[in-house]
Amino acid sequence: MCTHTGHSAAPSLSGLIDAEPCHFWLPLMPNEPTDVLPPTSFNVPFGTRPGIAALGERFFTRLSPTPLPSPYLVSVAPAAAALLGWNETDLQDAVKDPAFIDSFVGNAVPDWADPLATVYSGHQFGVWAGQLGDGRAIRLAEAQTPGGPWEIQLKGGGLTPYSRMADGRAVLRSSIREYLCSEAMYALGVPTTRALSIIGSDAPVRRETIETSAVVTRLAPSFIRFGHFEHFAAREDHASLRQLADFVIDNFYPACRNAANPYQALLRDVSLLTADMVAHWQAVGFCHGVMNTDNMSILGLTIDYGPFGFLDAFDANHICNHSDQQGRYAYSQQPQVAFWNLHCLAQALLPLWRDANAADPEAEKAAAVEAAREALDPFRDRYAEAFFRHYRAKLGLRSEQEQDETLMTNLFRVLHENRVDYTSFWRNLSRVSSLDNSHDAAVRDLFLDRAAWDAWAAEYRARLQSEQSDDAARTTAMLATNPKYVLRNHMAETAIRAARDKDFSEVDRLMAVLSKPFDEQPEAESYAKLPPDWASGLEVSCSS
């Protein structure tokens, strides 16, 4: 969800904890189903389990998706389908069955499905926004597979009781971007939700202009967000809040159950996974664009691909979201924003270890706040450890040395000053020699100030020589760490323009290339080139 409602500085934990409870939610809608869709018998290679439906109807509304006229398959992702048990041969047979399209666009409800929309709230651009969703995402079912549970969700599946003033739809443009980036991020090794398919329709929807509709089928072990906890905390519904936390602990963080304070342990573990995720974003040059608390996964997964972007020319303060005029979610701000969002989660969870009958309420409150601080304290160290681990690997360094932070700081400075293409830099750096500048040309040519490269390269070579780096082994390791292919905005735009004319070949071509981002792929060399001049004029925003 992406709504620009303002901007605020990150408060301290005590500031959040001490704030008055928020009461700006919309009332829950009556839990009544929409018109019942025709059932369909569509065989799938997985069983199902209740998942979040076991919590009861305070957490969701059962409903049917809203059908789309004349749906058509845009693309299906074999790697994501494999999570549900389809091999490539069976998948090709499955997509030929009209029931596949009907099931995953929302035109019929399979006999194994239990569609519902969950309720959550959250902070958007630093401001409490009240109840937010699910406004257009409908959980179709929760698959039970040998690899664990996979929640199957239709994004763009139609109106829900939580749609507010929106239409419940997603457009083809944004659906292609989310579909491709979900699978690209997985291939890069970044924790992420997955994407099974896109199904389109010529049904018109109004955004800045009239566009056509699409539904992305998304997969994740769970789509529970920070905002789910914020919703019940804001309503002071502590029983439901505890029930939700227990569900998450029992299903995803079972080790927390053995802690003296399981809910504090949950907060700590979520913060650690969030730190890992954001450090990985920084390393691959990914900018999320709209890190609202309702877009933060309780499992530390990248979720809700909207106005995202990968860095082209390196700018530490890059803003990928045209709607983010003040740069709250700029590339350099992502770690701090993640920490701010964790403070919001801490505030939501705090009632779970408060004692309403304490003899000394002030002392009890201080102790509860301190427990929250203790849970969040490891975030900074965990983020720093993950950050330096990723960048040492990107630099081909096998050991930790005291000067590494200075080496990296100097590198980021010259990359920023020269607006060096981020992905191309790291890929070409993988092949430089530790002994001389004989293999420097490809990376040196990326710099406007060649002397700046020469100075930093001398520093880098000295560092490599200090650990007697073997160039061949180092190059192999760096090429497996520094991708050749990422989903640049102009690549997605090219696929979108073709798809508007019902040519989906570029979507499938990109999916194939991005599924092997570290491989050379000579036939895909054009996707590794610097962005064309027209790409600088592309803007992405919250419109989806």
Curated annotation (Swiss-Prot):
Any one Gene Ontology molecular-function term assigned to this protein's record: magnesium ion binding
Chain sites annotated for binding ATP: G133, G135, R136, K155, D167, G168, R218, R225, D304
Domain of life the protein comes from: Bacteria
Listed cofactors: Mg(2+); Mn(2+)
Reactions that this protein is recorded to catalyse: L-seryl-[protein] + ATP = 3-O-(5'-adenylyl)-L-seryl-[protein] + diphosphate; L-threonyl-[protein] + ATP = 3-O-(5'-adenylyl)-L-threonyl-[protein] + diphosphate; L-tyrosyl-[protein] + ATP = O-(5'-adenylyl)-L-tyrosyl-[protein] + diphosphate; L-histidyl-[protein] + UTP = N(tele)-(5'-uridylyl)-L-histidyl-[protein] + diphosphate
Binding site for Mg(2+): N295, D304
Keyword Ribonucleoprotein on entry: no
UniProt keyword terms in alphabetical order: ATP-binding, Magnesium, Manganese, Metal-binding, Nucleotide-binding, Nucleotidyltransferase, Transferase
Pfam families assigned to the protein according to its UniProt record, in alphabetical order: SelO
Residue positions of the active site: D294 (proton acceptor)
InterPro entries (UniProt xref): SelO
EC number: 2.7.7.-, 2.7.7.108
Record-linked HAMAP family: YdiU_SelO
Function comment: Nucleotidyltransferase involved in the post-translational modification of proteins. It can catalyze the addition of adenosine monophosphate (AMP) or uridine monophosphate (UMP) to a protein, resulting in modifications known as AMPylation and UMPylation.
Protein family membership: Belongs to the SELO family.
Protein name: Protein nucleotidyltransferase YdiU
Species of provenance: Cupriavidus metallidurans (strain ATCC 43123 / DSM 2839 / NBRC 102507 / CH34) (Ralstonia metallidurans)
